A protein has these predicted regions:
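Rossmann-like flavin
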Residues: 2-110
């Protein structure tokens, strides 16, 4: 039964629907965190420097680029970045620089 349910999600329509739901969940989570901070005054080491993902093979990078484009359609500010831009964003990746094909970056994530 589980296998059939899994296979039913392996199509473009289900992928788009699931991405939309993940984006909605992420937006809700981000808003809820802001509410908790505002209402409680809780302090933590909050850093909003964004989240970078890097890829070491072209196929994975192309899939991530397609997903980033889809997410942009739902309002997520995730963008595709070159290896050079990724290394400017996160210099600690320099040791892997030659292996990196490219990446994605979401500035508003923490």
């Amino acid at each position: 039964r589980w296998g059939l349910q899994f296979l039913a999600q392996c199509n473009d329509a289900a992928f788009e629907r699931n991405v939309a739901q993940l984006v909605a969940l992420g937006s809700y989570s981000h808003a809820a965190l802001k509410d908790v901070v505002r209402e409680t005054g809780i302090e933590y080491q909050r850093l909003e420097r964004g989240i970078a993902h890097f890829y070491v093979d072209q196929k994975s990078f192309e899939g991530a680029a397609a997903a980033a484009d889809l997410m942009a359609g739902f309002g997520v500010k995730r963008r595709v970045v070159s290896r050079e831009e990724l290394l400017r964003i996160e210099p600690a990746l320099a040791a892997y620089g030659e292996r990196i094909v490219g990446g994605t970056f979401t500035e508003t994530d923490e």
